[in-house]
Amino acid sequence: MKITDLTLIPASKYLFVKIITDTGISGIGEVGAWGFIDAAAECLKKFRGYLVGKDPFQIEHHNQYMYRSMYFRGAILMSAISAIDIALWDIKGKVLGVPVYELLGGRTRDKVRSYGAVFQFTPEAMAKGCLELKKQGFTCARLMITGDMSQTQTGMEDDIFNGKVKKYTDMVAACRQAVGEDFDFVLECHRSLTPSEAIAFGNAVEKYHPLFLEDPIAPDNVEVMADVASKISIPIATGERCNNIQEMELIMTKKAARYVRPDVCALGGITPAKKVAAMAEANYVGIVPHNPLGPVSTAACLQLDASIPNFTIQEFPSFYLQGGEAAMLKEPLEVEHGYIKVPNRPGIGIELIDDISEKFPPKQRGINAQINYDGSVRDL
């Protein structure tokens, strides 16, 4: 069996990849470089020249070859490799007639606990959003603590240390009061806090027992993240920006997080994500896969989640729950009580509809940063 072609499928804000073999069996993957999918597309076109004529079963070899063939790597290149890796696993599972998780060591669970996101930004509205998720059966909500990323301007109140910490703490307090104790929170900070703010906020919300604090500060300096982690009792989750296993390993050895967030569409695919899970298991670190993308990303995450012992919870995009992107699939994923059923179909368990690019026209994402009240730029 040989690879005969690699084609690109743009749809909505996503870029999917289809790898075709001479048997007629094909696999699908997804690019994680959202906002820069045009650049990733050029990488994929170059990798097509390498892949055509190759055996699709040599997944580790192809991953290593593409990774080591470039002097300069980074997010765009690794997103392209990720899409290819996922598609190759999809092919292998389909040819052998088994789900990918069977090729990764077998199933460790039948369903995957997930959390939905609350896209409201006042204490009252956030509490209402949590109640709605609980009504749907979810047992965990992602709270967008530091505000709406689509807003480009912050207010003067965000310059006041005590006011900012109190505002964010009030959000968590309102949500806890609304839903009671039998519900978890994930506190998404989007890298927007300073270390001092992160420590003060973490200590202020300790009594509400959030599951974890996600990316409280910019993750570029692991030593500083570790310092923040040492000064609060709430676990930190980070790692979504990592593009190789070495970056993930550093987070764990520096004790910067108790949960790591591999992105199968940015790290290099399922292949390195499985390695990260093994590293994390040895360090008693939980896996919370990053997944803000499309349905192929979700399906690939489920295969990883189903095959590892240290899975914690799965990010599940709320826009899928609202019905829009479920229509991208021939057979939608099943969600019940906040748990996603792991598909038992061969490969990654899903197929995109044939006319996906027509029903979901491609969109471009512009350059968007947030501006502080004084005119300076803040992290997004």
Name each model-derived stretch.
Residues 111-231:
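Metal-dependent enolase-superfamily TIM-barrel catalytic cores that perform enediolate-based chemistry
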Residues 42-49, 61, 203, 209-212, ...:
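Shared catalytic-loop signature of beta/alpha-barrel
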Residues 1-28, 32, 319-326, 367, ...:
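Structured beta-strand/loop patches that form or line metal/cofactor-binding pockets in enzymes
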Residues 99, 113, 184, 235, ...:
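Proline-centered loop/turn at the N-terminus of a beta-strand
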